[in-house]
Amino acid sequence: MLRSEKPVAVEDIVNIYKESPSVIITHYHGLTVSQVSSLREELKSKEAGFKVVKNTLAKIAAKQTGLDSITNLFAGPTAIVYSKEPVEMARLVVNFANSNDNLKIIGGIVDNHILDAYSIKELSKLPSLHELRGKIVGLLQAPATKVVGVLQATSSSIARVIHAHAIKH
């Protein structure tokens, strides 16, 4: 990489750190081009990205964005995976790493919290934000449905009693 290209590359990484609330740092040594392309396509379908980075440039970008604590994660052949949806991205990367031994999860950042590889694997087991919203809506609707059921049962019970009383007399 030419010296004149390095500031542009640092700026690209800075933009990724600023615009993506979640970034996973990986080592990709031994992955074939087709495997990397496959991972990129999967990530792109979920509005995420995969970028191979030079460690020194990634460290400079981390320092510029106040993420000094992750600079020690940049060693070896490093790539970052980034997205606005941390759970879905973590799930994709963990599944890919499980099926491809050459992709190693090193750590990451989610909403300015530093995570180790174990935490990212645990994050991948959580339901997505969309799934959580659906569960909350279901929980909020359940009491209203039960109240309607009780009210309907009461009115139909009263109607049966009145009908039975009318038949008797």
Curated annotation (Swiss-Prot):
Q: Which organism is this entry from?
A: Rickettsia prowazekii (strain Madrid E)
- Where, by residue number, does the polypeptide cross the bilayer? none
Q: How does it assemble?
A: Part of the ribosomal stalk of the 50S ribosomal subunit. The N-terminus interacts with L11 and the large rRNA to form the base of the stalk. The C-terminus forms an elongated spine to which L12 dimers bind in a sequential fashion forming a multimeric L10(L12)X complex.
Query: Which GO CC terms are listed, alphabetically?
Result: large ribosomal subunit
Name recorded for this polypeptide: Large ribosomal subunit protein uL10
Biological process, per Gene Ontology: translation
Which PANTHER family does the UniProt record give?
Answer: 39S RIBOSOMAL PROTEIN L10, MITOCHONDRIAL
Q: Belongs to which family? A: Belongs to the universal ribosomal protein uL10 family.
The coding gene here is rplJ
Q: Which Gene3D superfamilies match?
A: 3.30.70.1730, 6.10.250.290
